[in-house]
Amino acid sequence: LAWSNVDLKAQETITNAFDDLKRTGTVNEQDSEMRQATSDTALQKLLTQKPAAGYFCFAEDRMHDIRLDQIIPARWTERVFDTWLQLKGDCQPGEFYTWQIGVFTPFKELKGVSVSFSDLVNADGNKIKSTSFQCFNQEGTDTDGQTFRKTVCIPKGYVQALWIGMDIPASAKGIYKGKAFVKEGSSQPVEIAIELNVSGS
């Protein structure tokens, strides 16, 4: 039995509210930073910077869950251009670390979007294997315990959050670097630089 869209939206609202409560001590969904849409002026300026891929990607940490689906948050147009394709995060050994890639499609519909990964490597040459990572939008395990794969399509003018999960080994320690690759079909991928600081016990 798979969740319906209504079920998923309801769960998303509960999760977002819980995260707000942890961060701020209050629940105020509409005042969330990720609910504040960018201005028309900022959006038009962004659209003049059309990427070679024909769509925008924004790396986003798990503390700023993507909530808008037909307009981008002001946070993205306020960020420095060079940071759009960078994820820097902190996690602990043995943690299941999650983050997001926001894909914005103002110019065209995307068909067959996929995400792949390189290994993450630290200064000592230790690796977190790419096989430890997954994009939940395209693959996973359903409520019956069955594995699945899905084709991800994004309509023109929409924002799609691609959620990523990374299984960090219990032995991992240090700063690990690698890349995620977002692509449509067989086109050239958009590269996102990943830097994870793994520390603690």
Residue ranges of model-derived segments:
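Short glycine/proline/serine/threonine-rich loop/turn segments at secondary-structure transition edges
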Residues: 170-178
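An acidic-aromatic substrate-binding cleft motif
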Residues: 188-201
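Long, low-complexity or tandemly repetitive, helically biased scaffold regions used
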Residues: 1-5, 9
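Beta-strand-rich extracellular modules
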Residues: 167, 181-185
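Short, solvent-exposed loop/linker segments at the N-terminal edge
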Residues: 89-95
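Conserved, mostly hydrophobic/aromatic
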Residues: 101, 180
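Surface-exposed binding patches on compact interaction domains or structured appendages
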Residues: 20, 25-29, 33-35, 40-84, ...
